[in-house]
From Swiss-Prot:
This is Ribosome-binding ATPase YchF. GO terms for cellular component: cytoplasm. GO terms for molecular function: ATP binding; ATP hydrolysis activity; GTP binding; metal ion binding; ribosomal large subunit binding. Pfam families: MMR_HSR1, YchF-GTPase_C. ATP binds at residues 12-17. ATPase that binds to both the 70S ribosome and the 50S ribosomal subunit in a nucleotide-independent manner. It comes from Buchnera aphidicola subsp. Schizaphis graminum (strain Sg). Residues 277-360 form the TGS domain. The keyword Metal-binding applies.
Amino acid sequence: MGFKCGIIGLPNVGKSTLFNVLTKGNSAVANFPFCTIKPNIGIVSVPDNRINNLSKIILPKKITNAFIEFVDIAGLVKGASKGEGLGNQFLSNIRDTHAIAHVVRCFKDDNVSHIYNQLQPKIDVDIINSELILADFETCEKSILKLQKKLNFNKKEIEEKLVVLSKCLDHLKKFLMLKTLELDENEKKIISYLRFLTLKPTMYIANINEQKESCFFLNELEKMAKKEGSSVIPINSNLELDLIKMNEDEQKYFMKSFNITNLGLNNIIKSGYKILNLITFFTAGIKEVRAWAIPNGSTSLQAADKIHSDFRRGFIRAQIINYLDFIKYKSETKVKEAGKYRSEGKFYQIQDGDIINFLFNV
């Protein structure tokens, strides 16, 4: 199963352009609403210098980065929760993702129309978030009614669900997103089957240009995002789309000329990885050095299953080397001599950067 981050926003804010930057692809881009009808899905490599450093020592035949999926979902509009603009279909597409990248237009351009003929990023964000809240309210209300009819069966379990859902409904009635409601891990687990939209981790993507107004709009967006504990990643999508079409030398020259030290593209991918709460472990050998993405808190048995179900079924133990130890000692033999080579069982909690060799028998 891939880890999916859904790209959402109003029509004409630059979602498909951003998707093309992320995937270096050719998703349809046009100056009219609902250019994207069916969601485009792109597999995006996660930049990680550690895999390059390991490869310089091991010299493998193949290098494979960890990846996450970005899903380009069509623009939402007012009334989406009631079916406006094919809203039900698009809200369903968001429900299928694990996290949200909310693209907000923070630039003026007379050649690109705004669906409501006014550029106010805060209002744009409120429109989208309001639709997500309304959709969650409807989901919550329907679920409560269904559960109340089943109270004679599994009474204890149903009452437990009703307590949490009533808490959620009261919060949504105040037009507040569920991510701002204090829920413990058990409560989140109880309602996880409903896949609430406003409970999904979110990052805001500020689509900017070189104009002064972009700085003002960006500051406003950052203030708003801070209140809900979300991050804001600025990117000039059109500029970076031009950059990825250049060869490496041209790209370096252009970035140096315009004093660009870091691409927004990489920041978005890394932030997506972070809000999905993923960590990386490595498998390393002459054939391949590979990075694997797993949820933080995963056990060695779950990591084994990520590679192949046979690894999980026949699991014996996991041989672990810390990434920094391998970089320091340069080989497995020297790591062992230094006493830094470990053998762990199936309940060991994987740490970010672990290099793992799984022993199994089927």
